[in-house]
Curated annotation (Swiss-Prot):
It comes from Thermococcus gammatolerans (strain DSM 15229 / JCM 11827 / EJ3). ATP binds at R283, K284, E285, V299, E370, V371, V372, S373. Keywords: Aminoacyl-tRNA synthetase, ATP-binding, Cytoplasm, Ligase, Nucleotide-binding, Protein biosynthesis. Belongs to the class-II aminoacyl-tRNA synthetase family. Type-1 seryl-tRNA synthetase subfamily. Its EC number is 6.1.1.11. Consists of two distinct domains, a catalytic core and a N-terminal extension that is involved in tRNA binding. The keyword Repeat does not apply. This is Serine--tRNA ligase. It is found in: Cytoplasm.
C-alpha cells in the first residue's frame, strides 16, 4: 500500500510510475484520491472546530449554572453540535473507505533501475553463470537467449525433457495423481523423494550458515494476512480457500512470514530479521491453461525454501542484492547454468518495487525457465500489515521494508537437475553438493536397475 503523503506531495511521480507499469486506467485514481483526501481533511478540521466549540459551551454552561442563569440556548447549541459531529464522522468514515479502496489497489512505486517494458519478453538479462549443455538443434536459439555471453558445450544428442526423464527413472506417477487429484498433481517416487528432501536440507543448511532463522510456518493463514502480503487478484487466480473458514492455503511461505510480525512495533536493534521458511505451497494456477501441462514444472502443490527479510528502509536495497546472491550460490553448487533477469515494469506485479528472477537453462527444452524470484517490496506489505520499528522508546515508529526470495522450489530444481545432469543413456549424475544429503551420486533409469538386479 502506498503512503497517502506520497500521493499528496508527489502526485505526478505516482502517475508517471503507473504509466511506466502500463496501469494507465489508474492514473485518474490519483486525482480522485486527492479530492477525497481534501474533503476528508476538511471534514476532520470541521469536527475539531466543533469539538472545540462544544468544549467552550461546556465551560459557559458551568458558569451559568453557578450564576443561576438560564442554559437552554447553550444546551440546544451543544446538542446541535453533537448531531453535526455525528454526521461529519459518518462522512469521514465513508471518505476513508473510498480512499482505502484505491490505496489498497495501487501498485508499489518502482525503483529507478527497473526497465520499462510491456511483458516478460522485455525483461532484461543482466548476468549469466555456468557452462550450458546445448543440443546442436538449439544452438542458434541459445546464442540469442544468452546474448552470446555464456559458455556452452554442444551436444550431438538431444537431452530428454524432464517429463520423459520422470518416466525413464520411474520418478513420478502423473497418471494416478490425475486420477486421484486432477491435473497438475503428481506422486513423487523412489530416489526423487530423497532428492526433494535433500534439496530442502541443502538450502536450509546454507542459509542457516548465513544467519537465517529456520521456520516451518502455518500452512494456512487468515484473510488479513493474504490481503496484506499480496494483491486481490491472487484470491481468484492463485489462492485456495478453506470453505466455511477464514483460512487460506499458503501459495508460498513468504505470506505467513510477512504476517508473522503483523501489528507489531519491532525493536530497531533487532533488524534485520532474517528468516528461512520451509513449507509446501498450494496454487490454483488459474490463467495458465495450456502452459506446462505435462510434468512437474507448473503444479498445484510443491515444496519451497523461502528467504524472508525485515530490514531498515535504508538497508533494503543492499539486502535485495544479498538474497539474490544467496539463491545464485545455491544454483552454482547445483551446477545449473542460469541467467539473472531484471524484471520489467509490465511483468513486475503490484507488490515488488524491483524483482530479479533466476532462470535456469533447461537443456531438454532449449530455453531458460524461472526457478527463483527475489523481490524488494519496500514498505508496501509493511503498511498493509502494520509492521513498524523504532530505535528509542518514545520515537515515532517507522515502517520496515520486507524482502523475499526463493531459495529452492524443489519441483523446479528437480526439473533443472533432470534436464541438465542426464547422460545420453539417461543416467542422472547428481551434483557433489547433494551427495551427503541423498546418500547416492546418481540415479539410474529403471531398466538399468532391473538389469543390475537380474545380473
Amino acid at each position: 500500500m502506498l503512503d497517502i503523503k506520497l500521493i499528496r506531495e508527489k502526485p505526478e511521480l505516482v502517475k508517471k510510475d503507473l504509466i511506466k507499469r502500463g496501469e494507465t486506467e489508474k492514473v485518474k485514481w490519483i486525482d480522485e484520491i486527492l479530492e477525497l483526501d481534501r474533503k476528508w481533511r476538511e471534514n476532520l478540521k470541521k469536527i475539531n472546530q466543533l469539538r472545540k466549540e462544544r468544549n467552550q459551551l461546556a465551560v459557559q454552561i458551568g458558569k451559568r449554572k453557578k450564576a443561576g442563569e438560564p442554559i437552554e440556548d447553550l444546551l440546544a447549541r451543544s446538542n446541535e453540535i453533537v448531531k453535526q459531529i455525528e454526521e461529519l464522522e459518518k462522512e469521514v468514515e465513508a471518505l476513508k473507505k473510498k480512499i482505502d479502496y484505491y490505496l489498497w489497489r495501487l501498485p508499489n512505486i518502482t525503483h529507478e533501475s527497473v526497465p520499462v517494458g510491456k511483458d516478460d519478453t522485455e525483461n532484461v538479462p543482466i548476468r549469466f553463470w555456468g557452462k550450458a549443455k546445448v543440443w546442436e538443434g538449439f544452438l542458434e536459439s541459445f546464442k540469442e537467449q544468452s546474448l552470446g555471453k555464456m559458455d556452452y558445450e554442444v551436444l550431438s544428442w538431444r537431452p530428454r525433457l524432464h517429463v520423459d526423464m520422470l518416466e525413464l527413472l520411474r520418478g513420478a506417477d502423473l497418471e494416478r495423481a490425475a486420477k486421484v487429484s486432477g491435473s497438475r498433481f503428481y506422486y513423487l517416487l523412489n530416489e526423487l523423494v530423497i532428492l526433494d528432501l535433500a534439496l530442502i536440507r541443502f538450502a536450509l543448511d546454507r542459509l542457516i550458515e548465513k544467519g537465517f532463522t529456520p521456520v516451518i510456518p502455518p500452512y494456512m493463514v487468515r484473510r488479513f494476512v493474504e490481503e496484506g502480503a499480496t494483491t486481490f487478484e491472487d484470491f481468484e487466480d492463485v489462492i485456495y480457500k478453506v470453505e466455511g473458514e477464514d483460512l487460506y492455503l499458503i501459495p508460498t511461505a513468504e505470506h505467513p512470514l510477512a504476517g508473522m510480525h503483523a501489528n507489531e512495533i519491532l525493536d530497531g536493534k533487532d533488524l534485520p530479521l532474517l528468516y528461512v521458511g520451509v513449507s509446501p505451497c498450494f496454487r490454483k494456477e488459474a490463467g495458465t491453461a495450456g502452459k506446462d501441462t505435462k510434468g512437474i514444472f507448473r503444479v498445484h502443490q510443491f515444496h519451497k525454501v523461502e528467504q524472508f527479510v525485515y530490514s531498515r528502509p535504508e538497508e533494503s536495497w543492499e539486502w535485495h542484492e544479498k538474497i539474490i546472491a544467496n539463491a545464485e550460490e545455491l544454483f552454482q553448487e547445483l551446477e545449473i547454468p542460469y541467467r539473472v533477469v531484471n524484471i520489467c515494469t509490465g511483468d513486475l506485479g503490484y507488490v515488488a518495487a524491483k524483482k530479479y528472477d533466476i532462470e535456469a537453462w533447461m537443456a531438454g527444452q532449449g530455453k531458460f525457465r524461472e526457478v527463483v524470484s527475489a523481490s524488494n517490496c519496500t514498505d508496501w506489505q509493511a503498511r498493509r500489515l502494520n509492521i513498524r520499528f523504532r530505535d528509542k522508546t518514545h520515537e515515532k515508529p517507522k515502517f520496515v521494508h520486507t524482502l523475499n526470495s526463493t531459495a529452492i522450489a524443489t519441483s523446479r530444481a528437480i526439473v533443472a537437475i533432470l534436464e541438465n545432469h542426464q547422460t545420453e543413456e539417461g543416467v542422472v549424475k547428481l551434483p557433489k553438493a547433494l551427495w551427503k544429503y541423498t546418500g547416492f551420486k546418481e540415479i539410474l533409469p529403471a531398466s538399468m536397475k532391473e538389469k543390475c538386479c537380474q545380473d
